[in-house]
């Protein structure tokens, strides 16, 4: 694979690369690059997470040594799943199973458990050094990486450790690339700034889009003056709002029902969850999408790239109901092997039931 091909694959569908020039230089160096993504095992796996899962797949195919960090302690600090560490670890196992059955070659991943990292004294020394090189105000601003606001920092003091831990994860693993959703931007920028002060390697940050919830960009908690990445974090698909999310374990019928009831105004692309599912989840897996229609309405039509489909939708050439039916059909094809894998393992069925009863924001 050429340098340009690797760069194209790595950057495909990314919302932001910080910076593209640094990434190109790293690829051109021909050194074996190390990347990572850390995930909080915080509940059921919804399709929004398939966006970064696909990017992990892209990075592996581009020759990057990827680490998957099971951020169990981070989830515990963030009060996920009621702070039940055993349930959090169960959710981590479940997440890895989903990633595997999505098509990521997990034998090529370095899977690291935060439980092992926190046993090392060098790790905690690094956390303190990072904290010493960051202002309290900067740490509090970074709390949005946890899905929390700066004013919530008074809930308990452990929350203030979280951003320093995330930066320390990056340094401890000696990474070249940090992958995350746009909601992780503040942590990655903190890591880049602190790296200069501590003489550490400065990471390239790859930020994937956050899939908007099925209700579209309609959240009462959006206020004037909010930064763009914080706005996107507010309207994203959330496991704590089951009707706004599609879970990989949802039945075919539930997927169809949720898709058919989703926000999808005629001719509108902005914050349209159906179009986003097509762009970020379906088109990266398929060479075309077929819209089936009655001959009275023009008959079937195929689109070989997302831009062509979006253009036709904005121009009113595709009806929302036809778009939804095609999306549900393709999405169920992607989810079917994941569903079957989970069904073959009774322990995951029990896990899903437990997690469903324990999901917290």
UniProtKB/Swiss-Prot annotation:
Entry annotated with the keyword Transferase: no
Record Gene3D superfamilies: HUPs, Tyrosyl-Transfer RNA Synthetase
Sample GO molecular function, one term: ATP binding
Stated name of the protein: Tyrosine--tRNA ligase
PANTHER family: TYROSINE--TRNA LIGASE, CYTOPLASMIC, TYROSINE-TRNA LIGASE
Motif 'KMSKS' region, chain ranges: 236-240
Residues where L-tyrosine binds: 36, 162, 166, 169, 184
GO CC entries: cytoplasm
Protein location: Cytoplasm
Keyword annotations from UniProtKB, A to Z: Aminoacyl-tRNA synthetase, ATP-binding, Cytoplasm, Ligase, Nucleotide-binding, Protein biosynthesis
Residues reported in the UniProt entry to bind ATP: 239
Entry keyword Kinase: no
Catalytic activity: tRNA(Tyr) + L-tyrosine + ATP = L-tyrosyl-tRNA(Tyr) + AMP + diphosphate + H(+)
Biological processes, Gene Ontology terms: tyrosyl-tRNA aminoacylation
E.C. code: 6.1.1.1
UniProt cross-references to InterPro entries, sorted A to Z: aa-tRNA-synth_Ic (IPR002305), Rossmann-like_a/b/a_fold (IPR014729), Tyr-tRNA-ligase (IPR002307), Tyr-tRNA-ligase_4 (IPR023678), Tyr-tRNA-ligase_arc/euk-type (IPR023617), Tyr-tRNA_synthase (IPR050489)
